[in-house]
Design a protein with these regions (language model features):
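Active-site metal-binding motif and surrounding structural segment of the metallo-beta-lactamase
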Residues: 48-94
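Short, structured coil segments at secondary-structure junctions
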Residues: 7, 87-89, 110-111
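Alpha-helix capping at helix-to-loop junctions
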Residues: 90-93, 109, 153
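Intrinsically disordered, low-complexity boundary segments flanking structured domains
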Residues: 1-4, 119-121
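Metallo-beta-lactamase
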Residues: 95-144
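Short beta->alpha connector loops
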Residues: 45-47, 74-75, 136-140
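Conserved beta-strand hairpin/beta-sheet module of binuclear metal-dependent hydrolase folds
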Residues: 2-58, 145-153
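Short catalytic-loop micro-motif centered on adjacent basic/acidic residues
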Residues: 39-42, 67-70, 133
């Protein structure tokens, strides 16, 4: 099941709950950061793509997205990536050099003209904000990078 909620002004969360037998459930989150150049952080699970896209459309028209920030390339983060890139020719992906390499091994390699390579410590300047890539203190994938938004902290 995929739902959405507003976490803070200008930030919506799209959360998919995956049931894990005998262990409970796992929340898989993506985020929409609204602004002059809207950003989708991660794109949901491969298995839940249709549900994710329906919920995303309730938050923002995918044609209005300008960026996708891939925190990392695990399958629970790239599920709707190909569909979004196909539907929106102006959409660009922010990821690391290693992220591009890993995607090149998948059935959905990234076209380099639609990628902005960013590694931890580097900053992406958008129309209304600056995003500085940060490596979280704990992660399960060595290419994981979130960001610090200079507008929201």
């Amino acid at each position: 099941m995929t739902t959405s909620f507003t976490a803070a002004p200008g930030i919506d969360v799209i959360t998919t709950t995956a049931e894990i037998p005998t262990l409970g459930s796992l929340a898989i989150n993506a985020f929409v950061v609204h602004g002059a150049e809207p950003i989708l952080v991660d794109t949901g699970t491969v298995a839940g793509q249709a549900d994710f896209m329906t919920t995303l459309r309730s938050v923002i028209d995918p044609a209005d997205l300008r960026w996708i920030w891939l925190t990392h390339t695990d399958f629970d983060h790239i599920g709707s990536l190909a569909a979004l890139l196909e539907a929106n020719p102006s959409l660009c992906v922010i990821t690391s050099f290693v992220g591009v390499g890993i995607m090149g091994l998948s059935s959905t390699p990234l076209a380099l003209d639609r990628v902005d390579l960013v590694n931890p410590g580097q900053t992406v300047t958008l129309a209304d904000r600056r995003l500085t890539a940060v490596r979280p203190p704990v992660y399960d994938n060595p290419i994981t990078a979130g960001f610090l938004d200079d507008r929201t902290g």
